[in-house]
Amino acid sequence: QVVGHIINASSKDGYGGLVSISVGIQADGQTVNGIAFLSISESAGLGMNARDTDWYKQFNGKKGEKFEVTKAGDGELDNEKINAISGATITSRAVTNAVNAALYFVNNGLKQ
C-alpha cells in the first residue's frame, strides 16, 4: 500500500540559478506533507530566506494540483496560494515551480 511519495524536483528559475528540493506528497497525490532543500544559491538575506521554516512550512498540509505565488499576505485563505518572500518573488516562484513539478510527476508520471 502506497502511503505517500518523496520526489526530488528542481527549478532553474531561481535568481541564483537552480533550486533543488525534496517534496513529501501524500498518497492522494495532492497534499504536500512538506519540503526540504537539497541545494539553493540565492541572494543572502533575500532569496536565501526560502530556507526559513516560517516561509516554507506554508506548503505543509496544502492540497492542490498547482500552487501559485502571491504577494505576502494575499494568499492566506486560499489553499493553492503561496505567499512570496518579501523582496524575493523570483525565488518564491522557483521553489513553488519545483513543488508543482513534483505534484505533476506524481499525478502524471507515476500513475500512468
Place the predicted regions along the sequence by residue.
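Flexible, solvent-exposed loop/hinge segments and secondary-structure transition points
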Residues: 1-112
